[in-house]
Amino acid sequence: MPGPTQTLSPNGENNNDIIQDNGTIIPFRKHTVRGERSYSWGMAVNVYSTSITQETMSRHDIIAWVNDIVSLNYTKVEQLCSGAAYCQFMDMLFPGCISLKKVKFQAKLEHEYIHNFKLLQASFKRMNVDKVIPVEKLVKGRFQDNLDFIQWFKKFYDANYDGKEYDPVEARQGQDAIPPPDPGEQIFNLPKKSHHANSPTAGAAKSSPASKPGSTPSRPSSAKRASSSGSASRSDKDLETQVIQLNEQVHSLKLALEGVEKERDFYFGKLREIELLCQEHGQENDDLVQRLMEVLYASDEQEGQTEEPEAEEQAHDQQPQQQEEY
């Protein structure tokens, strides 16, 4: 697989070495890790699945491995959809490639998951990791998508871990790593009330004084029974009306959420296309392309806002030059 910058070996063949700015050469190395084809240019060892690679871990073993390495309390593979665990793995494998202060270890919402995967993408770029992160699939919390990615990441970890000691709790600097909620968990968790407690006779039984020995308890009149049954029927109708209204609200919120998700996926696809175009022309050392890449990989909104005016100024300055060339 070709490297980012290629050079020729003494015999005239392409050996995929990297020539740095100071003229030094980083030799290309080829690795084989558990049947994987992996390549390295002095940074991360890239791992690519092949047909002979069938060794995988079960869902329980892979979660136990994640919890043991980075001291988390995950119970399901789907909880890896927050991206926080991967960010800490990258800090462990390549110290300094990611800032754990910006990682949302208590992420519970999808936009927070995307924020973490954005940081992960930036760290992949810094370490020349070629793996494409399927963010739009992972943040949905589906089992198979997250299982496939963590299986690949386990092989990537085995290829790059050098055995150094690492304290994940200290590296998080006191941030509580709370597992994200299980996907599909109900938002509304209303406590159930016992039928006996809501019955009109229960309150009457509690409030009635103890009968004296020898005295005959008086029976409730027919008027009282009718009024109690009428109030119970009215309360049941009110509850049914509330249930209908809540169901309508839930339905409308689901429709709104689906619309927002479609819009998000649409713009995410556009950004992905821009990213691929920038990567294709990244070797041309175009300043505008570099600034666009910095905006795409910005770790927070403030960085993107501060970089956007500069990119626009550079684009405006370059337009007259391009017109003159044509």
Curated annotation (Swiss-Prot):
Which Pfam families does the protein's record reference? CH, EB1
- Domain of life, per UniProt, equals Eukaryota
Tissue specificity as recorded in UniProt: Expressed during early stages of apico-basal epithelial differentiation but down-regulated in most cells at later stages.
Biased composition (Acidic residues) is annotated at: 300-312
Where are the annotated segments for DCTN1-binding? 186-326
List of residues that carry Phosphotyrosine: Y166
Domain (EB1 C-terminal) spans: 235-305
Cytoplasm as a keyword of this entry, yes or no, is yes
> Which of UniProt's keywords are assigned here?
Cell cycle, Cell division, Cytoplasm, Cytoskeleton, Microtubule, Mitosis, Phosphoprotein, Ubl conjugation
Which ranges of the sequence are coiled-coil?
none
Q: Where is this region: Disordered?
A: 170-239, 297-326
List compositional bias (Low complexity) regions by residue number.
199-233, 317-326
Q: Where is the Calponin-homology (CH) domain?
A: 56-158
Modification Phosphoserine occurs at? S9, S218, S235
Task: List the InterPro entries.
Answer: CH_dom (IPR001715), CH_dom_sf (IPR036872), EB1_C (IPR004953), EB1_C_sf (IPR036133), MAPRE (IPR027328)
Phenotypic consequence of gene deletion: Mapre2 knockdown inhibits chromosome segregation. Mechanistically, perturbs CDK1-cyclin B1 activity in metaphase I-anaphase I transition.
Gene Ontology molecular function: any one? microtubule plus-end binding
Protein purpose: Adapter protein that is involved in microtubule polymerization, and spindle function by stabilizing microtubules and anchoring them at centrosomes. Therefore, ensures mitotic progression and genome stability. Acts as a central regulator of microtubule reorganization in apico-basal epithelial differentiation. Plays a role during oocyte meiosis by regulating microtubule dynamics. Participates in neurite growth by interacting with plexin B3/PLXNB3 and microtubule reorganization during apico-basal epithelial differentiation.
Summarize the subunit comment.
Interacts with DCTN1. Interacts with APC (via C-terminal). Interacts with monomeric and polymerized tubulin. Interacts with SLAIN1. Interacts (via the N-terminal region) with BAG1. Interacts with ASB14.
Free-text comment about domains: Composed of two functionally independent domains. The N-terminal domain forms a hydrophobic cleft involved in microtubule binding and the C-terminal is involved in the formation of mutually exclusive complexes with APC and DCTN1.
Please state what the protein is called: Microtubule-associated protein RP/EB family member 2
Organism per entry: Mus musculus
